[in-house]
Amino acid sequence: MATIHIESLKEDIAPIVLMPGDPLRAKYIADNFLTDVKLVNKVRNIFAYTGYYNNKRVTVFSSGMGIPSMGIYAYELYKFYDVKKIIRIGTCGTVNKNVKLLDVILATSSYSLSTFPLLFDLDTGKEYFSSVLLNKKIKDVALAMNINIKSGEIITSDVFDPYVDHEKFISNFPDKRFLASEMEAFVLFYLAYKLNREASTL
């Protein structure tokens, strides 16, 4: 069963999806970390691959950049492909002095001024949360691999904030102490909440 934006059959997609923004990063992950890999989507050059990691079937599916693109792919994967868990794996920026280059951040929630929830279902929430259970699994694996993780709230923005005035950007969030800013996690967490699925963001 294909959708408007995804050509895959339902059985092509694993219940667990890793979701980088960049299609070429999805290809890199598939080429270097998965075995028995199959290309399952290339519509609009949004590449997706399904294969095995440590004998666990997983799909790596690129989201593109920004809330609208993530909203399309996360919704279709959750709704029509019966995906249970999506873990966004991507880059972010920060103005937090405690966060250093190459630190790994696990988002416990995302705050945004996006109108996506309002337009989607008249929801007015500005903050949505990642899966506590999925986050615990991620932390447990990181601990076992001796990888330090910083966890906390992030901001999801509709603009690429390095291009705008820093002080003006920060003034939109006067009461927030966030670890990082990025452009996709908010809608992923929102759709997981609406569709009773799980989501995390690294």
Give the residues covered by each predicted segment.
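Glycine-rich beta-alpha junction loops
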Residues: 23, 93, 155-160, 187, ...
